[in-house]
Amino acid sequence: MRNQNQPVAIEGYPFIGLFAFITLVFALLGWSVCTLLFLGLTLFAAYFFRNPDRYSDAEDAAILAPADGKVVYVGPALEERYFKSEVTKISIFMSVFNVHVNRVPMAGKVVDMFYNKGQFLNAAMDKASLHNEQSGMLLEHTSGRRMLVVQIAGLIARRIVTYPVVGDILQRGARYGLIRFGSRVDIYLEDDVDIQVTVGERVCCGETVLGFLK
């Protein structure tokens, strides 16, 4: 799995390298305003693609937040692709200032994946779950419980990265992907989950407990 140890996600290297090179060129030319501008862009790119370590000692039944951000929806939702029924959905919106590396919320096996091209609506809107570009991963816990995790592109985000493939065994809290520049992650949970978060709450990827498997 990529990005397990680097302090900055490798997807950010091209942006950081480009801005740093342009900064150097302007500095050599003596163009101070442009130098400061691109130095700022270099630092922002490094900040945006930051990849901090996260740790949780929560019990095995705990489901961890797959993304940093704000909870914008908790409640019932119809999931037609896999569950074909109404399940519990939790949606987390990531602004451009949040860490954008995503982590595995529940240990398990990747039993299926999908990718849909789509629109780039504001990821804070509920209809983004239906219409935006998205990449989904269906996990199966050792208990047989399943969970669908969906990375959704936003108004600015135009690139979803997902590292695992079908058949991979993932550890809870491991880095599994990234979405560039503002986005959303939806989790669909089967019944018998004790939800611990509410709408408006800020969550920390890989640390905040969203709920417990019963």
From Swiss-Prot:
NCBIfam families per UniProt: PRK05305.1-2, PRK05305.2-5
Task: Tell me one GO molecular function of this protein.
Answer: phosphatidylserine decarboxylase activity
| InterPro entries for this protein | PS_Dcarbxylase (IPR003817), PSD-A (IPR033175)
Q: Name one Pfam family in it.
A: PS_Dcarbxylase
- Tell me what this protein is called: Phosphatidylserine decarboxylase proenzyme
Main location (coarse class):
membrane
Provide the membrane topology annotation: Peripheral membrane protein
Q: List the disulfide bonds.
A: none
The protein's role, per its UniProt record: Catalyzes the formation of phosphatidylethanolamine (PtdEtn) from phosphatidylserine (PtdSer).
Q: Which reaction does it catalyse?
A: a 1,2-diacyl-sn-glycero-3-phospho-L-serine + H(+) = a 1,2-diacyl-sn-glycero-3-phosphoethanolamine + CO2
Catalytic residues in the record: 183
Please name the pathway: Phospholipid metabolism; phosphatidylethanolamine biosynthesis; phosphatidylethanolamine from CDP-diacylglycerol: step 2/2
The organism encoding this protein is: Syntrophotalea carbinolica (strain DSM 2380 / NBRC 103641 / GraBd1)
Locate the site labelled Cleavage (non-hydrolytic): 182-183
The record's note on quaternary structure and interaction partners says: Heterodimer of a large membrane-associated beta subunit and a small pyruvoyl-containing alpha subunit.
One GO CC term on file: plasma membrane
Q: Per the annotation, how and in what number is the cofactor bound?
A: Binds 1 pyruvoyl group covalently per subunit.
GO BP term (any one)? phosphatidylethanolamine biosynthetic process
Which PANTHER family does its entry note?
ARCHAETIDYLSERINE DECARBOXYLASE PROENZYME-RELATED
